[in-house]
Amino acid sequence: MPKPKGTCGATKMKILAVIHSNEQSGDVSYGYNIWQSLKDNFYTYMNDNDIRNVYHHLNDLCSLGYIRKCPEASDDIKQCYRITSSGSGIQEKYNHFLEVLEKNA
């Protein structure tokens, strides 16, 4: 049974951890490289068709105010994402995913 729309499950927490980790290392978070990181580190969304699910999660996280689109990007180029202060405020919920990313780095 799917979670109600607007809730934060494990996949959204993993995405927040990936974006947070990228920001800490000075990398930019795009939908594609977030998906690659989910595949490589968490063995999630292994099918190439699953990338669309990542974009649904990114849109939900934007709506919830945990991430934002980079202001310098426009709709006709790659969209990057950054953590907001609200997203940083729930870091304790995705810390264990950050540890996995650090261990695999």
Residue ranges and their predicted role:
Residues 17, 36, 92:
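A cross-family signal for key residues in well-ordered alpha-helices
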Residues 30-45:
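DNA-recognition alpha helix
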Residues 62-72:
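A short, conserved structural fragment
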Residues 72-93:
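Short, cationic-aromatic polyanion-contact patches
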Residues 89-105:
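Amphipathic alpha-helical dimerization/coiled-coil segments
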